Amino acid sequence: IARKAAEEHAKGNPFQIGMFTGASTGDKLDGELARANAIKFRTPYQSNKDLRAALNAHQAQYFDLHLSELAQSLRYGFLGKIDVAIVEAADVTEDGEIVPTSGVGILPTICRMADRIIVELNCRHPKEIRGMHDIYEPADPPLRREIPIYTPSDRIGNDCVKVDPAKIVGVVRTDEPNEGGKFSPLDDVTMAIGKNVADFLVSEIKAGRLPKEFVPLQSGVGNVANAVLGCMGANESIPAFNVYTEVIQDAVIELMKQGRVKFASGCSLSVSNEVIREIYANLDFFKDKILLRPQEISNNPEVARRLGLIAINTALEADIFGNINSTHVSGTRMMNGIGGSGDFTRSAMLSIFTTPSTAKEGKTVSYTHLRAHETLRHL
């Protein structure tokens, strides 16, 4: 698509696409298309520097919304029709059963709504991953009922996405690894943040404000989140716990091997390629400990409130009134987007935001008397 856009632009012809994704993607998608000026519209979340530059230069339209709301907004018709769904699969059958790979995102909704489906059959993900997914779409109003998840391990749907096989217009075989981003090494600052959070949670247990059995944890992405998870796992005063989150990252898998994480429910395995290979090589161990759901379910505020989550996410900036800016640098330039942090924070039993005290090599302060931009009012 990027090459086609470049060719058409060289001829003086317009060529751009609108794009819906689950959340952020790798450079081969967001980066390539942004550099080719091939994106007209993008939602809901991104983390690519070239796409970010295009958005802030107003070269592409961007809709920043809570991840849990995207699938239903598509079904409601708020965002227009879907012409083509391009989906990655570990397996696809002749009768239209698509087995997702390491992420689900908005897969069931776009497959049902798209006029045509192109399946990228990636042999890096074994067919045996089938059974690690729980595919469920809620009914739309006025027929919607509760989402019947009462523990993170509850299964409520199918192990694959079922589509009309006539809509599948192509199957492309690939052998591509995930574009897993490397996080910065843990340092004294991130480890101190992790220890502070772990110590705080222990104090809440001792004070009786958290049950001694503990509650499920939701954690954002990044080296601070990894440090928090590591410190929680190392603190013996915190019992082994479940995870109900959007992205499952390396630290969760390591704690699972140690017996400190009992079960993890999420939308995607956002782990390094070394860890994804380890998971696939030991599916007998991991398959009954990991469940991947559509983000409409993994991030659903109803479920977060019912489970009583501890939500731990990252902020760009916070002020002394409890307001959080997690989207706009200096209040004006879009960073990545709200992502899933608002889904969880607004409904968690206990919500925590973490960030180092300073950024940009100490040139900017993360905690202010009044934030430059308000993403969430966190009181």
Spans of model-derived segments:
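N-terminal low-complexity segments that are often proline-rich with Ser/Thr-Pro
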Residues: 376-379
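Conserved alpha/beta enzyme-core scaffold
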Residues: 1-374
